[in-house]
Amino acid sequence: MRAVYILAMACAATLQASSSALPSTKDLNSQVESLVPSDITDSAHVGGVRLLRVEDKEEETEEERGFGGALADGLKKLNPAKAAKKAKEKAAKIKQDLKEIGEHAAWLEKMRETIGKD
């Protein structure tokens, strides 16, 4: 039963702290209007309210809606021909690495024999 009371108090304290940390919207608007110097920033004012961002080039703005863009990109990555080509390239690289390791091991063994003879 104590756990329920502790949990309720923790929730109440969290809600109280989070709600008191945010200023009211009236105070927020007045702070934005009074604290931003107009000579430093190039801002647009409409009806006495400062706009944060202005986009002049609307033609270049592209939005991806739905799954079209993500789905097309995913399907491009799932090309089986490219996957087979990549697997073949990886296998060739592994074979080359194994060949080089074998050559290095043979050279190392030869050097050990040469050092051991002296």
UniProtKB/Swiss-Prot annotation:
Expression induction per the record is: Expression is induced during host plant infection.
Major site of localization recorded for this protein = secreted
Signal peptide residue numbers: 1-21
Q: Where is this motif: RxLR-dEER?
A: 50-64
Its transmembrane ranges are none
Q: Which InterPro entries match?
A: RXLR
Disulfide bonds listed in the record: none
Secreted keyword on record: yes
Keyword Transferase among record annotations: no
Explain the purpose of this protein.
Effector that enhances P.infestans colonization of Nicotiana benthamiana leaves.
Q: Any notes on this protein's domains?
A: The RxLR-dEER motif acts to carry the protein into the host cell cytoplasm through binding to cell surface phosphatidylinositol-3-phosphate.
Q: Which family does it belong to?
A: Belongs to the RxLR effector family.
Q: What is this protein called?
A: RxLR effector protein PITG_19617
Q: Which organism is it from?
A: Phytophthora infestans (strain T30-4) (Potato late blight agent)
